[in-house]
Amino acid sequence: MSWRGNCVKIFLENSHDVREGRKDENNMKDEYVAYVGTYTHGSSIGIHLYDVNVEEGTLTERKVIPVNNSSHIARSLNGKYLYSIADEGVAVFAVEDDGDLTPINKVDIDGMRGCYLSVDKTGRYLFVAGYHDGKVTVVHTHKDGRLGSLMDGVFHKGLGSVAERNFRPHVSCVVPTPDNKYVCAVDNGIDQIKMYKLNTQRDRLKLVDILRCERESGPREIVFSESGKYAYVIYELMNKVDVFSYRDTGNGPEFEKLQSISTTSANVDQAHDAASGMCLSPDHHYLFTSTAGDNTVAMFHIDPETGCLEKKFALPISGEYPKDIAMFPDGKHIAVANHESNTITTFTVDYEKNVLVQKGRPMKVETPNCILITKK
């Protein structure tokens, strides 16, 4: 697995579809909702459901669906179901026509509370990342929406830098590669991304390679480009994004490092800042990140030829600890879940002036962990 290589930055003309505000007609005809997962130690009781006004870039709270400590949520591949962390297990809900949620069942994951969910490209398997116990769990899913038995569970081993928090495994993200050939398990504690092969015949995860990150970098999340050729890794402790090329060699995954770029504004305190959220714009022309402490959202233009990033801005978001971010489907607005100020803020993204324009007052919601904006 390679870390060599430099990126030649050839920044092409930005997409007129986004820059000139041209809306996708299909997106504008569809109706959308937002789900916000919260901790339930205080007054919140679960997943907050919002109606989304795409044109205005606003959210209107409708109701709260009870579920304990919804630290992360994910939609099924066919869109019919919503998965949520639920204490030491995972709950699944049927998504009704109006976006409301009806409980189906819940399974225990034989470990501590998870922090991240994703599904494979067939929709047959649900992946759970375990931050507290350093575990990767795979759960069978059924066609009727029910969660089935645990397929496999792997505990990471090893030590990090043996300094404060990152001294043992903390799996913070588990996602399949775009070709569905491998499973990437990002370990925030031991500064590694472990690559597994999913053996569906034996119901086992097999470790095939390890991407070793910088010591004390704290990799938090990985996302892939629409083409599947590039991967973006955000680092919680170094407040940066690394760009990698990705391909399957036939003998295993190959990642080649192309670029590193900061997520923060000019005046930062590395000791108290923590890069946290990351998402792509709907047209995949831009990458957005959020950084706690600095309390900013950054926007990067993605070069379509090289996958490399050009930072356009890193601006304050009128909240504390922007733990997660989500783009509206028109690409013109962004929502920020501010975990410690107990708010959600929404902004219009001005691609011409490279600024964020806040939409109204922050909305109160206790300890928001994650936000998902999706079609009803």
Task: Give the role of each language-model region.
Residues Y39, D87, Y131, T141, ...:
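Short loop/turn segments immediately following the C-termini of beta-strands
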Residues D51-E56, F93-G99, V139-G148, K197-D203, ...:
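Short loop/turn segments immediately following beta-strands, especially the blade-tip
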Residues E61-G123:
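Blade-loop segments of beta-propeller domains
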Residues P103-S172:
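Asp-box/WD-like beta-propeller blade repeats and closely related beta-sheet repeat scaffolds
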